[in-house]
Regions:
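Conserved SAM/SAH-binding beta-strand->alpha-helix loop
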Residues: 52-54
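Short SAM/SAH-binding signature in class I
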Residues: 87-94
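Conserved class I S-adenosyl-L-methionine
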Residues: 20-29
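Gly/Ala-rich phosphate-binding loop of Rossmann-like dinucleotide-binding domains
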Residues: 38-39
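Conserved SAM-binding motif I beta-strand of class I
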Residues: 45-50
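Conserved alpha-helix/loop element of class I SAM-dependent methyltransferases that forms part
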Residues: 4-20
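S-adenosyl-L-methionine
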Residues: 60-85
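Glycine-rich SAM-binding Motif I of class I
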Residues: 31, 35
Length: 97
């Protein structure tokens, strides 16, 4: 089984995002935050967004390993510049820069 170990910073972000119907994780990098929230049933769905395809590919692989890729959409974009961004009821921008 896939195991998520969030850093204290990401764990704090996760607490604020709990209960979201659609979370946008901007600058998702590895995708640990939305994956953890989905695995624990704390959110309904998420968009993992990153401007770089390499980290986004890593997030996609982690989601497949965790078995939650059906509830996670991947967008290679700048910030919230993806279709349907206005439908997100929670946004996390953590660890950028």
């Amino acid at each position: 089984m896939y195991k998520t170990n969030l850093t204290p910073r990401l764990a704090l972000c996760a607490r604020y995002a709990e209960g979201a119907h659609l979370l946008a994780d901007v600058g998702t990098d590895h995708g640990y935050l939305p994956i953890s929230l989905l695995m624990h049933g704390k959110i309904d769905a998420a968009v993992a967004a990153d401007i770089n395809p390499g980290p986004l590919s890593s997030a996609r692989r982690h989601a497949a390993e965790a078995g939650c890729e059906d509830k996670l959409r991947f967008e290679c974009c700048d910030g919230l510049d993806f279709p349907g961004a206005d439908s997100c009821d929670a946004v996390v921008c953590a660890g950028m820069g």
